């Protein structure tokens, strides 16, 4: 079985992290976002993953080719010369997707969830129509495009973009399984599968929705990245608690790479991820943060709701909060306060940032 993952975007919403690396390779809970998806697909029996690539495609190809042998699957690249939206890449990869008559998965690269791939295959085969989409319930459906479907069968009737009155609290979760016949509906041109293809399929009774029972988050921007981390760690606590850290100074769900080092009298957690090579000196407090590979947090600093990029250096007695994001190789000098700062790579910060802003 095959899967196509849409990884061609520029990742602008997740800057400054994506100024150094394509978004699918950004570390989420100590593993590239893309690898979370590919590993889940492989575990469900997918043996061929096609990446619809554009931005930084050579970096993506090099990294994922290294994963082919480890995972025992085939990984192919489908190169977009121009942006093709969310449906055009399927037409571009038509020859690869149609090598067999089996249905195939399509994923948005921003999605992290309890991927129910095996259940989706069963659901798709049961209803026997062209397409199945994963939907998830949200508290504020007016912020999204919602899916109106039958409660018992899942048959999709229509899509409503950002409704002002309640029609449904189920939204498109960005994970699909499609029969090859769907490709006849798609031309090789910029096309939206959500706005141009799915509504027609729904009108013809060819589209069904399966509700996700576990967690879900689109982690394409920093605040949602951190929320997704919290949900992922909660799920990890339920399924694989042995992977989480415990011991003195560890509070709640904390994921620590074995190659990270934590000093004495620290308070780490809840909801923290520390990557390989991270050094946390004595007396540091970290809450609801992800600290990426080889970053160094000096003594007595206090971090909450932050993303600390690769190889950053945070000085002593620093306070950072309110979704502060440090790009790669940023230096924050001692005794500074950063409130909602977004700092581009390779900058040295010598004064406090009391109000949210971009540091270029």
UniProtKB/Swiss-Prot annotation:
Subcellular location, record wording = Cytoplasm
Region entry Hexapeptide repeat domain, spans: 245-360
**What role does this protein play?**
Catalytic subunit of the GMPPA-GMPPB mannose-1-phosphate guanylyltransferase complex. Catalyzes the formation of GDP-mannose, an essential precursor of glycan moieties of glycoproteins and glycolipids. Can catalyze the reverse reaction in vitro. Together with GMPPA regulates GDP-alpha-D-mannose levels.
The record's subunit annotation is: Component of the GMPPA-GMPPB mannose-1-phosphate guanylyltransferase complex composed of 4 GMPPA subunits and 8 GMPPB subunits; the complex is organized into three layers, a central layer made up of 2 GMPPA dimers sandwiched between two layers each made up of 2 GMPPB dimers. GMPPB catalytic activity is reduced when part of the complex and binding of GDP-alpha-D-Mannose by GMPPA induces allosteric feedback inhibition of GMPPB.
What is the species of this protein? Bos taurus
Tell me the pathway.
Answer: Nucleotide-sugar biosynthesis; GDP-alpha-D-mannose biosynthesis; GDP-alpha-D-mannose from alpha-D-mannose 1-phosphate (GTP route): step 1/1
UniProt-recorded name of the protein? Mannose-1-phosphate guanylyltransferase catalytic subunit beta
Q: What is the lineage of its organism?
A: Eukaryota, Metazoa, Chordata, Craniata, Vertebrata
Gene encoding the protein: GMPPB
Name the CDD domains for this protein.
Answer: M1P_guanylylT_B_like_N (cd06425)
